[in-house]
């Protein structure tokens, strides 16, 4: 195959095989040059799995993947991508420059990764909120700019990044279930500054409200944690409160009908949480949970009536 014409090499190297029986460096370079991203990932996985390349070499080879063409995002490609990212994330998550590069790869292929597979992207958002503000600048319109025409490629890119935005599921500066208030406020102030620079200040409440909905529980056993409560009381507007509530509501996902009994129980839990927050000096945060209680009480009534009318 080394002496074959380019057309033959292209056909050979686009095949997704995993045997690594020859000079590994030569094979990888040939696959990168003539193959597809799909075949390249399969070959890299085989080489790494067979311990024929090191983690550092794997990093160098993956640094080239944006030069290759993806045939299609199938389940096999997603599997090999996750398996190759994992050792790199483990090895370089504390190496700032390499972590950033791995994060950009995670972003590039966000359409086939779940949030928990995007470890470096999460770390980089925690380190620097500009990572998130740059994403916001792409997927949302500026406050004082008319919409512009986009070609299909750009529309597809924005669509993928919009889905990435909705995959993000963490509260800023959280480490091991703990959030330090000073760290959180510093992050918030930086993020707000970057939004202002991007002419997107109006999005502050919506974006931060969504992130706050992923807060860990507080030391007192109530949600959100104390640091997030204090930030809500200090910075919240209606958009922040609304987006927090909507995010909590949407996280329930698909569920089986119970004629309203499950919704009634959920509503009571939110009501109890809200009452506690209100009694302890968190009125804005309490209102979020009161609104959730009202929503679930309405859902409970609707489902009970549908059950009584034989719609289940």
Regions found by a protein language model. Give the residues of each.
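Inter-repeat boundary and helix-capping residues of tandem alpha-helical solenoids
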Residues: 256, 263-264, 282-283
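Short, charge-rich amphipathic alpha-helical segments embedded
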Residues: 284-310
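Short helix-adjacent coil turns
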Residues: 22, 274, 280-284, 288
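Short amphipathic alpha-helical heptad-repeat segments
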Residues: 259-271
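Structural register within alpha-helical repeat arrays
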Residues: 14, 207-211, 266, 273, ...
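Alpha-helical junction/boundary sensor with strong preference for TPR arrays
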Residues: 235, 239, 277-278, 296-297, ...
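Non-catalytic all-alpha helical scaffold/repeat segments
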Residues: 1-249
